[in-house]
Amino acid sequence: MFTMKKSLLVLFFLGTISLSLCVEERDADEEDNGEVEEVKRGVFTLIKGATQLIGKTLGKELGKTGLELMACKITNQC
C-alpha cells in the first residue's frame, strides 16, 4: 500500500511540474503578442542545399555532354 501511494505521489508531482512548465511557456508566448518564430535546423538545411547544388551542377554538365553528343551525331563529325 505504501509503495502504491508513493508511486502515485511521484506521478502527481511530475504531472504538476509538467503542467506548470506548459503554463509558463504559454504565458511567454502570450507576452510575445502571439508571434511565432520559425527555427530552421542547420544540418538538414545544409544537406538539402548541398544536394540541390550538386544536382544543378551535374544536370548542367550532363546536359552539355548530351547536347554536344547529339550535335556531333547530327553533323556526322564524331
Curated annotation (Swiss-Prot):
Bridged cysteine pairs (disulfide): 72-78
Protein location: Secreted
Gene Ontology biological process terms in this record: defense response to Gram-negative bacterium; defense response to Gram-positive bacterium
Disulfide bond among keywords: yes
GO CC, alphabetical: extracellular region
Tissue specificity statement from the Swiss-Prot or TrEMBL entry: Expressed by the skin glands.
Main location: secreted
Leader sequence segment: 1-22
Protein keywords: Amphibian defense peptide, Antimicrobial, Cleavage on pair of basic residues, Disulfide bond, Secreted, Signal
Entries under Pfam families matching the protein: Antimicrobial_2, FSAP_sig_propep
Residue ranges listed under propeptide: 23-39
Record's keyword annotation contains Disulfide bond: yes
Entry similarity comment: Belongs to the frog skin active peptide (FSAP) family. Brevinin subfamily.
Function: Antimicrobial peptide.
Protein name: Lividin-4
